[in-house]
UniProtKB/Swiss-Prot annotation:
Tubulin is the major constituent of microtubules, a cylinder consisting of laterally associated linear protofilaments composed of alpha- and beta-tubulin heterodimers. Microtubules grow by the addition of GTP-tubulin dimers to the microtubule end, where a stabilizing cap forms. Below the cap, tubulin dimers are in GDP-bound state, owing to GTPase activity of alpha-tubulin. Coiled coil: none annotated. This is Tubulin beta chain. Keywords: Cytoplasm, Cytoskeleton, GTP-binding, Magnesium, Metal-binding, Microtubule, Nucleotide-binding. GTP binds at residues 11, 69, 138, 142-144, 204, 226. InterPro entries: Beta-tubulin_BS, Beta_tubulin, Tub_FtsZ_C, Tubulin, Tubulin/FtsZ-like_C, Tubulin/FtsZ_2-layer-sand-dom, Tubulin/FtsZ_GTPase_sf, Tubulin_C. It is found in: Cytoplasm, Cytoskeleton. One of its GO terms (biological process) is microtubule-based process. It comes from the Eukaryota. The keyword Cytoplasm applies. Dimer of alpha and beta chains. A typical microtubule is a hollow water-filled tube with an outer diameter of 25 nm and an inner diameter of 15 nM. Alpha-beta heterodimers associate head-to-tail to form protofilaments running lengthwise along the microtubule wall with the beta-tubulin subunit facing the microtubule plus end conferring a structural polarity. Microtubules usually have 13 protofilaments but different protofilament numbers can be found in some organisms and specialized cells. Belongs to the tubulin family.
Length: 447
């Protein structure tokens, strides 16, 4: 059955990954030791997408945990779900990447990468029909960004026809952890544009805003942020893990969401938002879910979709919901907000429905949108990159690891191209599109 192999790299990736495994173990009725004590057959039916059934009736995640320093791994291992993972699947170095993309991609990370690929290969061989890979990492650091993108391109080489989805935490405008974030992020985006099939962009600042504005948490911890991310990851992967009336898998999602191969950076949202450990205080209805889901305040990336247009989007509903009601609501949203959807892709909203709600909720919805406003995010990083690169600030850390300045220039222009592509399709109209098609036809004939 369509398995997915999960990789988590770097500190951020491992913390988000741990939260994700905790969430879906709960949904499938597994305890911290991987023993099943659930209540419904639905939990078992497609357990094998993410879990391997081992001896002693234990379920083991198909997860590979990677880091260049042992700290985060130890934290995962000693956490409540530490015994869940297969001990051989922890692959770590000792030196750390020190927030340096070049260390993760070229020196330290490159030494460890073969060891990781062996584990990935072993996991892939244990699958009946591997659907693809998902990777959690941040783009601002050294290991998640540098080594994460190295792994993506290596896995791409070895499994060219499998899907590659990434959950990438992008640097946020106000909350910055390191000065060299713009460098690391630009170099990573340069890789993701080429090697990933779908990238779900998550942004710490947007998560902080949700925690403070919507959930009224005065001092959100990373635990609270990771809880939100794991809710989205669980939502995006629901239809792979549970039966439903309208299912989608990674490939179906990509086919419906990516109109042009380079434009595969998605904004994600989730409704209803609840804080960790808290439950919803009122009954939620489908209209409310759709309303909340399309609310800019619910987006987990700090770019406002009202400044751009949706090329495509997808809504995944969970719970006992009537299909008709969902379709009516989605049509309603499209009719009311026509200006936010490009008119040259008719019916560009895809819906999926799954009958099993997340724990503690009657129904929920996950939103994935391919909006041209994501360019704001790249623009912002690009401006910060340009400001530092103009003075060649901090560059010696990268060139010292064997990188060349050309690589920075290439990465910068690739990201600028991405921004202008998004802008071009934002402004495109139906008639223009027709002219372009005609022009292409004429060129073809001449050839």
């Amino acid at each position: 059955m369509r398995e997915i192999v999960h990789l988590q790299t770097g500190q951020c990736g491992n913390q988000i990954g741990a939260a994700f495994w905790q969430t879906i173990s709960g949904e499938h009725g597994l305890d911290g030791d991987g023993q099943y004590n659930g209540t419904s057959d639905l939990q078992l039916e497609r357990m094998n997408v993410y879990f391997n059934h081992a001896s002693g009736d234990k379920y083991v995640p198909r997860a590979v945990l990677v880091d260049l320093e042992p700290g985060t791994m130890d934290a995962v291992r000693s956490g409540p779900f530490g015994k869940l993972f297969r001990p051989d699947n922890f692959v770590f170095g000792q030196s750390g990447a020190g927030n340096n993309w070049a260390k993760g991609h070229y020196t330290e990370g490159a030494e460890l990468v073969d060891q990781v690929l062996d584990v990935v290969r072993r996991e892939a061989e244990g699958c009946d029909c591997l659907q693809g890979f998902q990777i959690t990492h941040s783009l601002g650091g050294g290991t998640g960004a540098g080594m994460g993108t190295l792994l993506i391109s290596k896995i791409r080489e070895e499994f060219p026809d499998r899907m590659m989805a990434t959950f990438s935490v992008v640097p946020s405008p106000k909350v910055s952890d390191t000065v060299v974030e713009p460098y690391n992020a630009t170099l990573s985006v340069h890789q993701l544009v080429e090697h990933s099939d779908e990238t779900f962009c998550i942004d710490n600042e947007a998560l902080y805003d949700i925690c403070m504005r919507t959930l009224k948490l005065s001092q959100p911890s990373y635990g609270d942020l990771n809880h939100l991310v794991s809710a989205v990851m669980s939502g995006v992967t629901t239809s792979l893990r549970f039966p439903g009336q309208l299912n989608s898998d990674l490939r179906k999602l990509a086919v419906n969401m990516v109109p042009f191969p380079r434009l595969h950076f998605f904004m994600v949202g989730f409704a209803p938002l609840t804080s960790r450990g808290g439950s919803s205080y009122r009954q939620v209805s489908v209209p409310e879910l759709t309303q909340q889901m399309f609310d800019p305040k619910n987006m987990m990336a700090a770019s406002d979709f009202r400044n751009g247009r949706y090329l495509t989007c997808s809504a995944l509903f969970r719970g006992k919901i009537s299909m008709k009601e969902v379709e009516d609501q989605m049509r309603n949203i499209q009719n009311k907000n026509q200006s936010y959807f490009v008119e040259w892709i008719p019916n560009n909203v895809q819906t999926a429905l799954c009958s099993v709600p997340p724990r503690g909720l009657k129904m929920s919805s996950t939103f994935v949108g391919n909006s041209t406003s994501i360019q704001e995010l790249f623009k912002r990083v690009g401006d910060q990159f340009a400001a530092m690169f103009r003075r060649k600030a901090f560059l010696h850390w990268y060139t010292g690891e064997g990188m060349d300045e050309m690589e920075f220039t290439e990465a910068e222009s690739n990201m600028n191209d991405l921004v202008s592509e998004y802008q071009q399709y934002q402004e495109a109209s139906v008639s223009e599109g027709e002219e372009e098609y005609l022009a292409e036809d004429i060129v073809d004939e001449e050839v």
